[in-house]
Design a protein with these regions (language model features):
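Solvent-exposed alpha-helices and their adjacent loops that cap or buttress functional pockets
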Residues: 3-6, 70, 90-93, 112, ...
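Flavin (primarily FAD) binding-site architecture
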Residues: 101-119
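Rossmann-like dinucleotide/flavin-binding elements
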Residues: 12-37, 77-87, 92, 106-108, ...
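N-terminal glycine-rich dinucleotide-binding loop that anchors FAD/FMN and/or NAD(P) in oxidoreductases
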Residues: 50-77, 113-129, 135
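Long, contiguous hydrophobic alpha-helical segments, chiefly transmembrane helices and signal peptides
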Residues: 43-47, 56, 61, 156-157
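Residues at alpha-helix termini
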Residues: 29, 70-71, 101, 162
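Fe-S ferredoxin-like electron-transfer domains
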Residues: 1-35, 39-40, 47-55, 65, ...
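Conserved N-terminal/central alpha/beta ligand/cofactor-binding core
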Residues: 47-48, 64-97
């Protein structure tokens, strides 16, 4: 990879997940200066927060991000959320272009009568798992019920069992 000569354009990329990082990479390759904004404390998006720990151990997302930032012409500002402390109109006024790669912002809530402590959505639970230095600090019950049928549900079930849940349904 070699960066093209300075193009004289500055681009804002909102979201430091796979799409935002890929966009920043291609823009930097063409000689554009890129500022990536992300609401989370670390970049990487679902690669950092959404892949179960048993599937991708270590800091692979941060290693990739560190490599990307060494290319030149790319900076990242974490903890900046679009619409709160980062107005879209301001970005449009300060940059030649804005690329929105905001990704998944939430999950569907399950309405369960009598819900109590211990009920968590799988996306947040997997995120907590990925960010925990000691996986045994992440709470898991002896009997775990996972509601859902996608890969996130499978990841939550497998990770629960790996952490010592006696029964996972």
């Amino acid at each position: 990879f070699s960066r093209a000569p300075e193009a004289g354009r500055k681009v804002a990329v909102v979201g430091a997940g796979p799409a935002g990082l890929a966009c920043a990479h291609r823009l930097a390759m063409k000689g554009h200066d890129v500022v990536i904004f992300d609401s989370k404390p670390k970049g990487g998006g679902l690669n950092e927060y959404g892949i179960a720990a048993y599937k991708a151990p270590g800091d692979f997302a941060q290693t990739e991000l560190d490599w990307l930032l060494k290319i030149g012409g790319i900076t990242i500002e974490n903890g900046r959320a679009l619409g709160t402390d980062l107005p879209l109109a301001d970005l449009q006024g300060q940059y030649d272009a804005v690329f929105l790669a905001i990704g998944l912002a939430g999950v569907n809530k399950v309405a369960v009568d009598g819900a109590h402590e211990g009920l968590a959505n799988a996306v947040d639970w997997i995120s907590d798992m990925r960010q925990s230095a000691d996986k045994t600090d992440v709470p898991v019950g002896r009997n775990v019920v996972v509601i859902g049928g996608g890969m996130t549900a499978v990841d939550a079930a497998v990770q629960s069992k790996l952490l010592g849940a006696e029964q996972v349904t």
